[in-house]
UniProtKB/Swiss-Prot annotation:
Transmembrane segments: none annotated. The gene is guaA. It comes from Ralstonia nicotianae (strain ATCC BAA-1114 / GMI1000). This is GMP synthase [glutamine-hydrolyzing]. Pathway: Purine metabolism; GMP biosynthesis; GMP from XMP (L-Gln route): step 1/1. It catalyses: XMP + L-glutamine + ATP + H2O = GMP + L-glutamate + AMP + diphosphate + 2 H(+). GO terms for cellular component: cytosol. Its EC number is 6.3.5.2.
Amino acid sequence: MPILSLHNMHDKVLILDFGSQVTQLIARRVREAHVYCEIHPNDVSDAFVREFAPKAIILSGSHASTYEDQDLRAPQAVWDLGVPVLGICYGMFAMTVQQGGKVEASAHREFGYAEVRAHGHTRLLDSIEDFRTPEGHGMLKVWMSHGDKVTEMPPGFKLMASTPSCPIAGMADEARGYYAVQFHPEVTHTVQGRALLERFVLEIAGAKPDWIMRDHIEEAVKSIREQVGDEEVILGLSGGVDSSVAAALIHRAIGDQLTCVFVDHGLLRLNEGQMVLDMFEGRLHAKVVHVDASEQFLGHLTGVTDPEAKRKIIGREFVEVFQAEAKTLTNAKWLAQGTIYPDVIESGGAKTKKATTIKSHHNVGGLPETLGLKLLEPLRDLFKDEVRELGVALGLPPEMVYRHPFPGPGLGVRILGEVKREYADLLRRADAIFIEELRGTKATAQDAVAGLCTEDQVGKSWYDLTSQAFAVFLPVKSVGVMGDGRTYDYVVALRAVQTTDFMTAHWAHLPYALLGRVSNRIINEVRGINRVVYDVSGKPPATIEWE
């Protein structure tokens, strides 16, 4: 079912993307206010904008320059609809130019933290401030990222905010509901950013906060039943959050018309295969076909050391194994995938040349055409946090729904260099010990005093306080001593990060006692490993995964 028809019952916000790296964060903030929104390229047609029928429109930032990129404009329908419009950074420039103002290159570029002074009284910034100056001026702590600046506001606009180097850092035409800010309210660095966006969406635009996951189940189930009818569906079940929630939702809708295919490529976490089977066969009573293809995958990975080559091999072999199994299910007419909204956005970005590939993503793209199947993607409108919320509402256990992210190629990209069964077995056990200790260790008041956590985090497990944690197998040996003998065994690295969006991440400051206990257990319980190191790299410059 087209997205527009499924969500016509909700008030919607349209976000037009000019190529910013943080446009997704705008959508997440709007969704967190329980208002449905979608991201679309800035060059959509006027007809699309009118058909979307938004309650409000937000124009994103961009790396581009307004006066150099004349094609980066909002459709005319944006200004003709009569709904509130918020321009952010480049979106402010687009609004300025299209409404008759002027934008020029700034002699002083601003990248990073800044303090913005609010001017006058506007609905958007009324009572929203971080502190006041001795003179009584309301101030906001914000994040700036721009090289141009507005030098002349369009007719009808008034000054809303400024900095010493950016005299027009915010402007408003309140009669038409047009607002623009030079800073980025969507990023966490802008302290009052969430309040600003909620003010715009809920109060100025009057959107109803009715985007609730438990209510979405009923809508999604109805949509799936209408799409599928009495036809059968197959789904590649990986054990990850997305495919698990997709399977649970589809099974809720059509029951035994769904067959899940679980491919074990030999690179799963410890006991992961059995856990998936117990959940979907035992608890949900879903049909699951278990395929052990570990020999095939590991065989094709022999001698391969390049990370990108490993990803492509694992993706190719998954397609072949899944395709062979799918052909035995002759009644299947649909292929279901756990595609989520960031995947959709990034694919669109790639098509418009607004995204750059850092690593190949392991998925089953291409299967629908190869198999002649129709594609069913029930999660394609949802962000990861919404998928987790939906999973809990569907009855999946929290320990499955809130598991840390696991790459599609599995341990294949957590074993540096060549992948061997021996390495995978060692890594599986080391990783399980690390995760077990993280789950079993709670943050203490002493940890809070030491600055390792906040007071409100005391009592939570360190697994829940980290966004992603795992072990990495290093294909090098080091000398050690155990008992009276010399050892010459492998090394594993532990990686744990904390992040809100996975675009940037800080390495997790875990208690030394916890790290020491993990190291001691791995060295004593996993024969073949005699050294454990901890990764203290942030993102950037490092990525979260090592490969």
